[in-house]
Each structure stands twice: as structure tokens, then as C-alpha cells.
Amino acid sequence: MDLNDLKIDPEFEEKIPPLTEDEFSLLEQNIVADGEVLDPLIVWNNTILDGHNRYRILKKHPEIPFRTYPKDFSDKYEAIAWICNNQLGRRNLTPEQRRYLIGKRYEAEKASHGGHYTEPDAETGQFTVSLSGEDLRLPERTSEKIAAETNTSRSFVENAERFAKGVDAAEAAVPGIRSG
């Protein structure tokens, strides 16, 4: 894939905590010293999901080789949920950044598939409920699913969504407030 084919969606990028100037500079030095980008840029429909900083470095150094790894999602909300979940794996998140990402993931997953989460039947792909009572599976709340995966509580996840909406509102009122 050509570098010029890739796009940055501001809605996706704003879910990713920014690097400090020192962190960005160190990343650039490492990429230039390695002579390649070691980690692939993760993309969905040529839009970058992970690798925004690497992409900016590549724009400054177009001679450096890179790879992409495509992901498949049914809509932008699934992509946003993936971005948030992927960022939650970072070790250097502040508690506020983690809370924001959990809130945005919850918001995106609700928008993608509604407020409940169930797995489709393995054979049919259909979402079904057995009336026999033996295999009755009630839909799991999206907040409960995320809470279990992030070692938090349902109320934490639901409060994190309100926190994230507040952060977004503050950012809309005073641009740049989120990054410091």
C-alpha cells in the first residue's frame, strides 16, 4: 500500500492519547535508526486505526519502508471500540485516559450493536433464545461485558461513558483542553 492512500480520521485519532514531544522524537529517532517501521500501521478501509505517529514520521521520511495490517469491521463504531480496547493495552495510560477510553468503547459498542451483547449461534449466525430453558442465555449488558474485560464494574463503565462525554464537551468548548 502506498503512503498517500492512507487517511487519518480525526474522530479515530482523538481516541488515542497523544505522545509527548519527547516520546514522538524518540519514536522518530528509533524508526530512522532501524531504517524501517517495525510495527505495521493498522488500517480499516485505508483509514489508520493505530499508527498515527508512525504515519506522520513516514510522511517526513517517505523512503522508510512500512507495512499495513488491515482490519475488518462492519461500521465505524466497531472500529472505534477496537481503537479504545487496543489503547487500553498501553502501560503508560493515566487513570483519566483509561477511564475515557473505557467510556468511549462503551459508547461505540452500544452504537454498533445496541445496548446488549450476545454471541450468535455458531452454525446459523443468528441471535436466538432457547425456550426449553436448558440453554437460555439472556443478553449480557454491554457494560457488564466491558467491565469483565477491563476488571472494573458495570457502574464504573457507565460512569466512564458520562466522563468521556464530559471530556468531549469540554474539548468542543475549549479546543486543546484534552491534551493538556
PLM features per residue range, with description:
Residues 91-180:
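Alpha-helical interaction elements
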Residues 23, 27, 76-80, 98, ...:
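Alpha-helical structural motif
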Residues 1-71, 78-92:
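Short, charged/polar connector segments at secondary-structure boundaries
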